[in-house]
């Protein structure tokens, strides 16, 4: 069987609110950490989200 190429990741808010999104990423195409600007409903603003591991 083929090895999994996509890995589940958690996008954690840099505002420190504890809010996160879950998504997948291709390990081969994007080996470095993701940084995306997404909406944080806790503070009701768009904020930078950093990649973290799912436990």
Swiss-Prot record:
Q: Name one GO molecular function term.
A: structural constituent of ribosome
Biological process terms in GO annotation: translation
Q: Which parts pass through the membrane?
A: none
Keyword list, A-Z: Ribonucleoprotein, Ribosomal protein
Q: What Gene3D superfamilies is this protein classified in?
A: Ribosomal protein L33
KW Heme (keyword) present: no
Q: Provide the Gene Ontology terms for cellular component.
A: cytosolic large ribosomal subunit
The source's domain of life comes to Bacteria
An example Pfam family from this entry, by short name, is Ribosomal_L33
Return the similarity comment: Belongs to the bacterial ribosomal protein bL33 family.
Q: Which PANTHER family match?
A: 54S RIBOSOMAL PROTEIN L39, MITOCHONDRIAL, LARGE RIBOSOMAL SUBUNIT PROTEIN BL33M
The protein's name in its UniProt record: Large ribosomal subunit protein bL33
Q: Which organism is it from?
A: Buchnera aphidicola subsp. Acyrthosiphon pisum (strain APS)
């Amino acid at each position: 069987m083929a090895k999994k190429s996509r890995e589940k990741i958690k996008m954690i808010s840099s505002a420190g609110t504890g809010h996160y999104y879950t998504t997948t990423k291709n390990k081969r195409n994007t080996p470095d950490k993701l940084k995306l600007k997404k909406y944080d409903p806790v503070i009701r603003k768009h904020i930078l989200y950093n990649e973290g591991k799912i436990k």
